[in-house]
Amino acid sequence: EVNPAFFKALIDTEDERFYKHIGIDPIGVFGAAKDALLHHDARGASTITQQLAKNMFRVRSQYSTGLLGKVPLLRLLIIKSKEWIIAVKLETAFSKKEIITMYANTVDFGNNSYGIKTAAKTYFNTNPKDLTADQAAILVGMLKATTYYNPRTNPENSRVRRNTVLYNMLT
């Protein structure tokens, strides 16, 4: 069991249309593409389901060889296509609750802490069901950059990011 505040923080911060899409968020994809074309700050458009696909099936290989490794845009297109296909298959095979639970149990929280149970123990010496809303927000905030937002090594960065996540939960 996990404190529902964790899932609320996760959805409100990482994938606000989680319950409305089928694994791919066209609005997010369009917004990210528009930002990239206009040279604005890059933002992620991956849904929680796409991130689960990446976590479970290692869609993104660190080692690209041949043509794929030499043409970054082609590499990105192939990677995203794989993520989209797997995400849609996950959405047809599992419920939203199962998907978000699988994600929570596989995501990397840094410091070799994979999954919410290990992260809750590592960072707060507690169980996922006993996390406070602040602790849940810190863990979700870390997902953006686990080292930069690590509460042990970068407490100020973690505090600022936690506040952003808490704000997302209120709006």
Model-found features: residue ranges?
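Peptidoglycan glycan-strand catalytic modules in the bacterial/periplasmic cell-wall system
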Residues: E1-T171
